[in-house]
Amino acid sequence: MLDQAVAYLCCPHCRGNLLLDGRSLRCRAGHSFDVARQGYASLLGGDARTGTADTAAMVAAREAFLGRGHYARIRAAVADACAAVGPDPRGCVLDVGAGTGYHLAEALDRLPEMKGVALDVTRHALRRAARAHPRMAAVGGDAWRMLPLRDGVVSVALNVFAPRDGDELARVLAPGGALVLVTPTGRHLAEAIAALDLLTVDDRKRERLEGKLGGRFDHAGERSI
């Protein structure tokens, strides 16, 4: 699927356009990125925070959890929001922090004319995302750094329980594009938090989120699940 998505990608070192040359992505400046045999390409820059990447066991556990339908309502709501934006085949659907491509695959089913890019820092997740949907490309990238996508090529950006850089999301979104953002409430994973004495969701999370995204995006609506 990388052959269909390369038109949206750029070099993480020089921001030059990329071309698919056999089993590599290359820019005119000579930077080259191998395509793994599993079908994904890593476009992580030199300053990427790979130390935060999930292990193979963590990815397998998450895939099993999602496969049991625990997030099915969230997945459907994300797909509904994408469908409401409407298809724009000139741009792609980007999922920042896509993991295995669980949410993006459903969104692409609802937008049959569009292609998707699953961006994640974890190679174990990218291996699964590369085969999650025939119109999904899996690309290694750090949500906290420059996104390896060209300016204004994203029609819909997804960000589901994942980190984000508001400036970068605004840069890659096309005029009239939409950001579909999913954040936890205080009830998120409440049973696990209580049983394992984990950190709770910050009461000021919404305020901090609006502070980071304010001025770049107009609020179009929200839904609680």
Pin down the residues of each PLM region.
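Class I SAM-dependent methyltransferase Rossmann-like catalytic core
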Residues: 51-77
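Substrate-binding/catalytic lobe of Class I Rossmann-like enzymes that use SAM or dcSAM, i.e.
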Residues: 194-225
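A short acidic, Gly/Pro-enriched loop at the edge of an enzyme's catalytic core
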Residues: 145-156
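Glycine-rich helix-loop-beta junction characteristic of Rossmann-like nucleotide cofactor-binding loops
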Residues: 80-88, 147-148
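A short SAM/SAH-binding and catalytic strip from SAM-dependent methyltransferases
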Residues: 154-168, 183
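Class I SAM-dependent methyltransferase SAM/SAH-binding core
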Residues: 92-95, 100-146
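A short glycine-rich, Lys/Arg-flanked "PGG" loop and its adjoining helix->strand segment in the class I
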Residues: 166-180
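N-terminal auxiliary segments of SAM/dcSAM-dependent transferases
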Residues: 1-52
